[in-house]
């Protein structure tokens, strides 16, 4: 991972209590390897790494990435 590469970072802001964030592994078997629970207003800054290839978010949240901003409540 290139430390100067900001595209690997993303921000999750909870819009309600109990938003679940799951980190998923790379490899032939995709597995959950980390989970966090965020309450309303809490912000998590995370990044993709050699171990994390995907993130699943359950609940109402805003996700900001280098590609733009997503709202889990809105259909694009």
From Swiss-Prot:
One GO BP annotation is: regulation of DNA-templated transcription
Listed A to Z, the keywords are: RNA-binding, Transcription, Transcription regulation
In its UniProt record, a GO molecular function of this protein is: RNA binding
One Pfam family in the UniProt entry: TrpBP
Which InterPro entries does the entry mention?
A: MtrB (IPR000824), Trp_RNA-bd_attenuator-like_dom (IPR016031), Trp_RNA-bd_attenuator_dom (IPR023558)
Cysteine-cysteine disulfides:
none
Q: Which family is it part of? A: Belongs to the MtrB family.
On assembly, the entry states: Oligomer of 11 identical subunits arranged in doughnut-like structure.
What's this chain's function?
Required for transcription attenuation control in the Trp operon. This trans-acting factor seems to recognize a 10 bases nucleotide sequence in the Trp leader transcript causing transcription termination. Binds the leader RNA only in presence of L-tryptophan.
- Protein name as it appears in the record: Transcription attenuation protein MtrB
Q: Which organism is it from?
A: Halalkalibacterium halodurans (strain ATCC BAA-125 / DSM 18197 / FERM 7344 / JCM 9153 / C-125)
The organism's taxonomy opens as: Bacteria, Bacillati, Bacillota, Bacilli, Bacillales
Encoded by which gene? Answer: mtrB
């Amino acid at each position: 991972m290139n430390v100067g590469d900001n595209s690997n970072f993303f921000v999750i802001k909870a819009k309600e209590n109990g938003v679940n964030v799951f980190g998923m592994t790379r490899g032939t078997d995709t597995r959950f390897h980390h989970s966090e629970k965020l309450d309303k207003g809490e912000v998590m800054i995370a990044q993709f790494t050699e171990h994390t290839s995907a993130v699943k978010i359950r609940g109402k949240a805003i996700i900001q990435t280098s590609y733009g901003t997503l709202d889990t409540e809105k259909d694009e």
